[in-house]
């Protein structure tokens, strides 16, 4: 590990010489083809919502963009039909 000078604020920044191996993320919904995204599948939809009922972002779940849009639409439909709550915890 070596230190390199940062020209932005004249401070030293630690730089790691090793290049890390980044594993490519695989969409968890694309792997299971038998499980379809549906607004009636409450168990699946609850995996992609937070404790407070908010939809989790792609960077946390690892879902591809196409499936994330389908998930969002299914969660909105399930909320509208009162299958899942809008907010689960008291704030």
Swiss-Prot record:
SUPFAM superfamilies: Ribosomal protein S18. GO terms for cellular component: cytosolic small ribosomal subunit. GO terms for biological process: translation. The keyword NADP does not apply. One of its GO terms (molecular function) is structural constituent of ribosome. InterPro entries: Ribosomal_bS18, Ribosomal_bS18_CS, Ribosomal_bS18_sf. Gene3D superfamilies: Ribosomal protein S18. It comes from the Bacteria. This is Small ribosomal subunit protein bS18.
């Amino acid at each position: 590990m070596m230190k390199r000078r940062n020209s932005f604020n004249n401070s030293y920044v630690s730089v790691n010489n090793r290049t890390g191996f980044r594993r490519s993320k695989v969409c968890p919904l694309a792997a299971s083809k038998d499980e379809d995204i549906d607004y009636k599948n409450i168990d699946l939809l609850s995996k992609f919502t937070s404790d407070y009922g908010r939809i989790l972002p792609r960077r946390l779940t690892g879902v591809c963009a196409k499936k994330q849009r389908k998930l969002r639409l299914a969660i909105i439909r399930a909320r509208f039909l009162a299958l899942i709550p809008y907010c689960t915890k008291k704030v």
